[in-house]
Amino acid sequence: MSEEFPSPQLIDDLEEHPQHDNARVVKDLLAGTAGGIAQVLVGQPFDTTKVRLQTSSTPTTAMEVVRKLLANEGPRGFYKGTLTPLIGVGACVSLQFGVNEAMKRFFHHRNADMSSTLSLPQYYACGVTGGIVNSFLASPIEHVRIRLQTQTGSGTNAEFKGPLECIKKLRHNKALLRGLTPTILREGHGCGTYFLVYEALIANQMNKRRGLERKDIPAWKLCIFGALSGTALWLMVYPLDVIKSVMQTDNLQKPKFGNSISSVAKTLYANGGIGAFFKGFGPTMLRAAPANGATFATFELAMRLLG
């Protein structure tokens, strides 16, 4: 199998844009924001179920979590803490896609004298860079979201009255960036896989029909490619996400699982074996396809509208 694919920019050929094109960067970021909002609206119920499964202290199932959530909190419980990811994930996806596209332009211009294509390792490197940069924004946002998602009280009985109070308490306990290391590892390798798979699928589609342009690929195919890319991402990094979630729901003053990946992993394995690293895997995989299909389709369609 060839290691090189056509190097398609989102809408136009990469050659048409200089490496430092501010207008292109703004469009990338705006389209990424739209994709992130779509991801949250589609995926939030699955994500809430996943987080509660990952952090449950007793064995349970996805259906049991859903049943209890509906009984105790109603349908709105699935969207608890949504404001934070709606704003935050929009920013995170915007950053992921923006950096990924900037790196694609960087490699394209670097390769100009040798080849007009990007290699598979270069596509992977683009995604890794976007993921690592995004980690520093995603980690605190996810920490706040997870704290809000997992608190069972409401109103005056809630530990956190909202995102701002949650941020204040996390900062007071010097814990806002707890879980940053597993987030960097998850986002780096995960986004590398994510964008590599997507670009490979896009390139394969363009190779099948001579003269086909990226902007001519229908939305339903973009959804399928995004769904497959999102599924590949989570297959690669899921145990790291469990470790991160456990770290971010642990006691703020005296974390019983410890503050490192190794200490959390040892405790999880001691308490639940290998299965402990895959709690919530079902809802995550159910979420991966529609949420990431919506992300990529919205992203590309937004880019077409922006021109």
Swiss-Prot record:
GO terms for molecular function: glycine transmembrane transporter activity; organic acid transmembrane transporter activity. GO terms for cellular component: mitochondrial inner membrane; mitochondrion. The keyword Mitochondrion applies. SUPFAM superfamilies: Mitochondrial carrier. Keywords: Membrane, Mitochondrion, Mitochondrion inner membrane, Repeat, Transmembrane, Transmembrane helix, Transport. It is found in: Mitochondrion inner membrane. InterPro entries: Mitochondrial_Carrier, Mitochondrial_sb/sol_carrier, Mt_carrier_dom_sf. The chain crosses the membrane at residues 29-49, 83-103, 118-138, 183-203, 223-243, 277-298. Solcar repeats lie at residues 26-106, 121-204, 218-305. Pfam families: Mito_carr (PF00153). The keyword Cell inner membrane does not apply. GO terms for biological process: glycine import into mitochondrion; heme biosynthetic process; mitochondrial L-ornithine transmembrane transport; mitochondrial transport. It is a multi-pass membrane protein. Belongs to the mitochondrial carrier (TC 2.A.29) family. Secondary mitochondrial glycine transporter required for the biosynthesis of heme at high glycine concentrations. Imports the precursor glycine into the mitochondrial matrix, where it is condensed with succinyl-CoA to produce 5-aminolevulinate (ALA), the first step of heme biosynthesis. This is Mitochondrial glycine transporter YMC1. The gene is YMC1.
